């Protein structure tokens, strides 16, 4: 998914003005990103940033997590100056940013910039039981749709007097019902 620079700026502006960040360094870094297009072009908003090769997590107050954390190759850094230096010196590299704030999933501004984390894709994080339930649902839905189509074709065969098609389609419908 491609997220435009203007969408990123719109989100960061909203985040800076709305989310309650207790450490001023968080706001400094977000504002720095906001005012440097070349860097912001390489920023990707993701979840599970700790799984990326280079990412930052910013956390709003009251959520019980470190408010500012840099991850580089599974190592953690909390020093704001070191984090700023990393951003500034490696501005050409992709930077993954996770923003943790209350009701993030109910916020359209956040959802409009959220991308799939290439290091931890969403579809690989689905519980196996949930995946089986989803697969079962789609199989059932496919069978329901197939039965509806067969019934419509049987009706057409009756209306046109096509006895052979009627018998063939009826047999297929009966086989589907027995599954």
Curated annotation (Swiss-Prot):
The family line of this record is:
Belongs to the UPF0302 family.
The record's annotation in InterPro entries points to: IDEAL_dom, UPF0302, UPF0302_N, UPF0302_N_sf, Virus_scaffolding_prot_C
Q: Mind telling me what this protein is named?
A: UPF0302 protein EF_1554
Matching Pfam families = IDEAL, UPF0302
Judging by the UniProt lineage, the source's domain of life is Bacteria
């Amino acid at each position: 998914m491609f997220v435009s620079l203007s969408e990123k700026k719109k989100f960061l502006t909203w985040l800076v003005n709305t989310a309650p960040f207790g450490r001023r360094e968080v706001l400094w870094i977000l504002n720095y990103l906001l005012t440097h297009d070349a860097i912001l072009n390489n920023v990707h908003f993701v979840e599970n940033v700790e799984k990326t090769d280079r990412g930052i997590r910013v956390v709003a107050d009251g959520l019980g997590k470190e408010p500012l954390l840099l991850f580089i190759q599974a190592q953690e850094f909390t020093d704001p100056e070191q984090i700023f230096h990393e951003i500034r010196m490696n501005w050409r590299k992709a930077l993954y940013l996770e923003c943790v704030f209350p009701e993030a999933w109910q916020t359209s501004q956040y959802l409009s910039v959220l991308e799939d984390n290439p290091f931890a894709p969403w579809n690989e994080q689905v519980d196996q039981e949930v995946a089986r339930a989803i697969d079962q649902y789609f199989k059932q839905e496919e069978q329901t749709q197939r039965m509806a189509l067969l019934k419509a074709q049987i009706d057409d065969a009756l209306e046109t007097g096509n006895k052979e098609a009627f018998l063939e389609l009826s047999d297929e419908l009966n086989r589907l019902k027995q599954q």
